[in-house]
Amino acid sequence: MAYLHHTLLVCMGLLAMANAEAPQEQDPFTYDYQSLRIGGLIIAGILFILGILIILKRGAWERFDTARRTGEPDEEEGTFRSSIRRLSTRRR
């Protein structure tokens, strides 16, 4: 009976050693997802803030341009409609 216990104990020890993972080399395709997530959130935040700034800057320039323009368009503008207006005002 003691022989059976020793045999079982040796077999269980061998199984435990077989199940224990040997140190493996680093897999080159294993990524640190926490760092990737943080980096992605930082880049997304920077792009979001830049987008808001661009939108606000365009809105400010459009308001500035419309406040500066009053009445008839400048004669320097080369649109067809402005050239017709200039010609029609000269005939009077």
UniProtKB/Swiss-Prot annotation:
GO terms for biological process: negative regulation of protein glutathionylation; potassium ion transport; regulation of monoatomic ion transport; sodium ion transport. Keywords: Cell membrane, Glutathionylation, Ion transport, Lipoprotein, Membrane, Palmitate, Phosphoprotein, Potassium, Potassium transport, Signal, Sodium, Sodium transport, Sodium/potassium transport, Transmembrane, Transmembrane helix, Transport. The chain crosses the membrane at residues 36-56. It holds the Pfam family ATP1G1_PLM_MAT8. Expressed in ventricular myocytes (at protein level). It is a single-pass type I membrane protein. Residues 57-92 are cytoplasmic. The keyword Chloroplast does not apply. Residues 22-35 are extracellular. The modification Phosphoserine is found at S82, S83, S88. It is found in: Cell membrane, Sarcolemma; Apical cell membrane; Membrane, Caveola; Cell membrane, Sarcolemma, T-tubule. Major plasma membrane substrate for cAMP-dependent protein kinase (PKA) and protein kinase C (PKC) in several different tissues. Phosphorylated in response to insulin and adrenergic stimulation. Phosphorylation at Ser-88 stimulates sodium/potassium-transporting ATPase activity while the unphosphorylated form inhibits sodium/potassium-transporting ATPase activity. Phosphorylation increases tetramerization, decreases binding to ATP1A1 and reduces inhibition of ATP1A1 activity. Phosphorylation at Ser-83 leads to greatly reduced interaction with ATP1A1, ATP1A2 and ATP1A3. Palmitoylation increases half-life and stability and is enhanced upon phosphorylation at Ser-88 by PKA. GO terms for cellular component: apical plasma membrane; caveola; intercalated disc; T-tubule. PROSITE patterns: FXYD. Residues 83-92 have a biased composition (Basic residues). Residues 1-20 form the signal peptide. GO terms for molecular function: sodium channel regulator activity. Belongs to the FXYD family. Associates with and regulates the activity of the sodium/potassium-transporting ATPase (NKA) which transports Na(+) out of the cell and K(+) into the cell. Inhibits NKA activity in its unphosphorylated state and stimulates activity when phosphorylated. Reduces glutathionylation of the NKA beta-1 subunit ATP1B1, thus reversing glutathionylation-mediated inhibition of ATP1B1. Contributes to female sexual development by maintaining the excitability of neurons which secrete gonadotropin-releasing hormone. The cytoplasmic domain is sufficient to regulate sodium/potassium-transporting ATPase activity. PANTHER family: PHOSPHOLEMMAN, SODIUM/POTASSIUM-TRANSPORTING ATPASE SUBUNIT GAMMA. Homotetramer. Monomer. Regulatory subunit of the sodium/potassium-transporting ATPase (NKA) which is composed of a catalytic alpha subunit, a non-catalytic beta subunit and an additional regulatory subunit. The monomeric form associates with NKA while the oligomeric form does not. Interacts with the catalytic alpha-1 subunit ATP1A1. Also interacts with the catalytic alpha-2 and alpha-3 subunits ATP1A2 and ATP1A3. Very little interaction with ATP1A1, ATP1A2 or ATP1A3 when phosphorylated at Ser-83. Interacts with the non-catalytic beta-1 subunit ATP1B1. This is Phospholemman. The gene is FXYD1.
